[in-house]
Amino acid sequence: MKAKFKVLIPEPKSKFIRIKCPNCGNEQTVFSHATFPVRCLSCGTQLVYPRGGKAKIVGETVRILG
């Protein structure tokens, strides 16, 4: 008998990221490949700038989810 090959399942490169606002310290979850600018819910500072592919994150990354 021949050994079966392991079936590879592709995984997405994008993730959800928990970031902290540099001005007020508020934490919120954003998408790593965001297509729209994301603002802080407390102070309104822009935290994520869309860049065509992966978004530019201004705040401090606290945790990567998933």
Curated annotation (Swiss-Prot):
CC cofactor note: Binds 1 zinc ion per subunit.
Protein name: Small ribosomal subunit protein eS27
A Pfam family assignment: Ribosomal_S27e
Xref: Gene3D superfamilies: Zn-binding ribosomal proteins
Cell membrane is among the record's keywords: no
Subunit structure: Part of the 30S ribosomal subunit.
MF terms in GO: structural constituent of ribosome; zinc ion binding
Organism (species): Sulfurisphaera tokodaii (strain DSM 16993 / JCM 10545 / NBRC 100140 / 7)
ZnF endpoints (C4-type): 21-43
InterPro entries documented for this protein: Ribosomal_eS27 (IPR000592), Ribosomal_eS27_Zn-bd_dom_sf (IPR023407), Ribosomal_zn-bd (IPR011332)
Ligand binding (Zn(2+)): 21, 24, 40, 43
One GO process term, biological-process aspect: translation
Alphabetical keyword list: Metal-binding, Ribonucleoprotein, Ribosomal protein, Zinc, Zinc-finger
Family of this protein: Belongs to the eukaryotic ribosomal protein eS27 family.
Cofactor dependence: Zn(2+)
Gene Ontology CC, one term: ribonucleoprotein complex
